[in-house]
């Protein structure tokens, strides 16, 4: 479960062009609790999960840390924050937290949701939970459904841009941002919402 202080904090107030130095002076990835998507999604852009982590990246990883916005391709305007520390990667976007890698409280794979609400019962939303692994292969971050299934997402750098290949076949080129845009501080509801009782 994500640290409540992380969810209560204002991650939109930070400058994401000022990245932590990964010099082994602080915590290791495995020392920090796992960050999962709370319920069907967070209510406000949260603080970084790995802010106290300074473990260097493994040789097979590229450094894609920071805040990114889609500028061309399938998901123009999409904004996501990528954190990395050691072998751990956290992608935070649109109400969702994808956290993969060694941690102090849970398994390696992500424990999150696609974001759409299957139904609401007595005012409480219920979403289908999902899981994926994030594996570095030749400086490309590949997401595999459930940790053993097909590759559904790829992220890699081309020059100063981040390239995001998604399961729907789209390819999005992304630029680096320093600040969270106002319209991305509070996530928009995703998918259907069916009220049962």
Annotate the PLM regions.
Residues 61, 84-86, 133-140, 156-161, ...:
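A short, structured loop/turn motif at beta-sheet edges
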Residues 153, 172-173:
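A short acidic/glycine-rich loop-to-helix N-cap element
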Residues 150, 169-170:
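Loop/turn residues immediately N-terminal
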Residues 1-88, 92-95, 111-114, 178-197:
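Amphipathic/hydrophobic helical signal segments and adjacent flexible N-terminal regions
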Residues 161-169:
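Short, exposed beta-strand-loop hairpins at the edges of beta-sheets
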Residues 2, 70-75, 94-158:
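Contiguous, well-ordered beta-strand patches that form the walls/edges
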Residues 80, 141, 172:
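A broad, low-specificity signal marking well-ordered, structured residues that form hydrophobic/aromatic
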């Amino acid at each position: 479960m994500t640290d409540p202080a992380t969810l209560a904090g204002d991650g939109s107030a930070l400058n994401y062009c000022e990245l932590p130095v990964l010099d082994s002076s602080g915590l290791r990835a495995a020392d920090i609790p796992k960050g999962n998507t709370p319920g069907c999604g967070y209510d406000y852009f949260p603080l970084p999960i790995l802010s106290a982590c300074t473990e260097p990246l493994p040789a097979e990883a590229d450094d894609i840390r920071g805040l990114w916005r889609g500028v061309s391709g399938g998901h123009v305007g999409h904004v996501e924050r990528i954190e990395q520390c050691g072998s751990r990667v956290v992608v935070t976007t649109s109400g969702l937290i994808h956290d993969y890698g060694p941690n102090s409280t849970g398994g390696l794979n992500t424990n999150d949701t696609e974001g759409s609400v299957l139904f609401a019962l007595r005012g409480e939303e219920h979403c289908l939970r999902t899981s994926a692994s994030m594996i570095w292969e030749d400086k490309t971050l590949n997401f595999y459904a459930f940790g053993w299934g097909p590759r559904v997402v790829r992220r890699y750098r081309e020059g100063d841009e981040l390239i995001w290949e998604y399961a729907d076949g789209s390819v999005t080129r992304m630029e680096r941002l320093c600040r969270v845009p106002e319209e991305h501080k509070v996530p928009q509801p995703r998918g259907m919402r069916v009220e049962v009782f």
